[in-house]
């Protein structure tokens, strides 16, 4: 199923089951990416690449998107979402933040955004611990 047909189906059927399925899809992608993040930290030559151009690209990608109309009359929704995604981008591997960005952009639904925001705020400390553990092991081997 392509992203376009996925979004069309989501707009037509905003059923609880379909929303739950979409959230589970996002959770699945995030969970599968944890080993990738750990592997990138074990091999510092991969993880030490400059992240600033990536953050600039993500920021420019999110600017034209109509989040305010999707989230209702909340004028701060656009800024909050961009700040949240940039925060994720600074604290996780590029693979993780791309997955989150694509997932949220495709959903355009406030309830799903809130659910994923809480989920990833719970996952972030775990990712931080993985980063610390991998960095410590790398320093010990030098």
UniProtKB/Swiss-Prot annotation:
The chain crosses the membrane at residues 19-39, 84-104, 111-131. It is a multi-pass membrane protein. It is found in: Membrane. Its main location: membrane. Keywords: Membrane, Transcription, Transcription regulation, Transmembrane, Transmembrane helix. One of its GO terms (cellular component) is membrane. Coiled coil: none annotated. It comes from the Eukaryota. Almost completely overlaps INP52. Identified in a screen for mutants with decreased levels of rDNA transcription. This is Putative regulator of rDNA transcription protein 16. It comes from Saccharomyces cerevisiae (strain ATCC 204508 / S288c) (Baker's yeast). The gene is RRT16.
């Amino acid at each position: 199923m392509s992203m376009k047909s996925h979004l069309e189906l989501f707009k037509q059927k905003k059923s609880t089951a379909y929303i739950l399925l979409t959230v589970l899809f996002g959770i699945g992608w995030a969970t599968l990416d944890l080993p990738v993040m750990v592997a990138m930290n074990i091999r510092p030559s991969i993880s030490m690449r400059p992240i600033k151009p990536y953050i600039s690209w993500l920021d420019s990608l999110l600017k034209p998107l109509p989040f305010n109309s999707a989230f209702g009359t909340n004028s701060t929704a656009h800024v909050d979402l961009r700040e949240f995604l940039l925060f994720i981008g600074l604290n996780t591997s590029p693979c993780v933040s791309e997955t989150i960005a694509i997932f949220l952009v495709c959903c355009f639904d406030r309830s799903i955004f809130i659910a994923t925001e809480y989920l990833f705020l719970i996952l972030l400390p775990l990712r931080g611990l993985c980063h610390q553990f991998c960095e410590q092991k790398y320093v010990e081997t030098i």
